[in-house]
Amino acid sequence: MSHEKVKELQVSALENGTVIDHITFGSVLFVIKILNLENVEDPIYFGANLKSVKYGKKGLIKVSNRYFRPDEINKIALVSPSATLIEIKDFEIVKKSRVEIPDDVKDIVKCFNPKCITNVEDVPTRFHVIDKVNLKLKCHYCEKITSKNIMEFR
C-alpha cells in the first residue's frame, strides 16, 4: 500500500452563487460579519491566509445561492478595496468584477459624532469619500471625518 501525500484539498465548486476573492489579509471574518453571512442557510466556504502571487496573502469566501446588492458590495469595498466578485450560474462564471469604493456612502457606516443628527434622529447616514487610498469619509450632515480605523457599520 502506498502512502501518497495529499498535495491539495479541493472545496466544492459553486453551482450558483458568488465568490469574493482577493479579500484583504485579515479581513475574511469581518466581511462575513458585515454581510451577515453567519445567518444564511446555504453553504459558505471561506479561506484565510491563502497564498497570493499579487497580494502575498489573501482571503476568499464562496457563498452558495447568493448574489450581492449594491449596498453590500459597497461594504465589501470599504473593508477590502482589492476584492473581486465572481458570480457563478450553473457552474459557469457569468460576471467578474472588482469592487470599487463609491464616491458617496449611504446608510452603511455610522457617524462617530454623538451629536450628529443621524445619531439623534431617525436619519440615514450619508458620507462623501474624501480619500479613497487611506479611506476617509466626511459626514454630509456634521462634516466630521471618519477614518478606516474608527469606522463602524450599521
Feature-to-residue mapping (PLM):
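Cys/His-clustered metal-coordination modules, chiefly Zn-binding fingers
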Residues: E92-R154
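Interaction interfaces in information-processing and related assembly proteins
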Residues: S2-S97
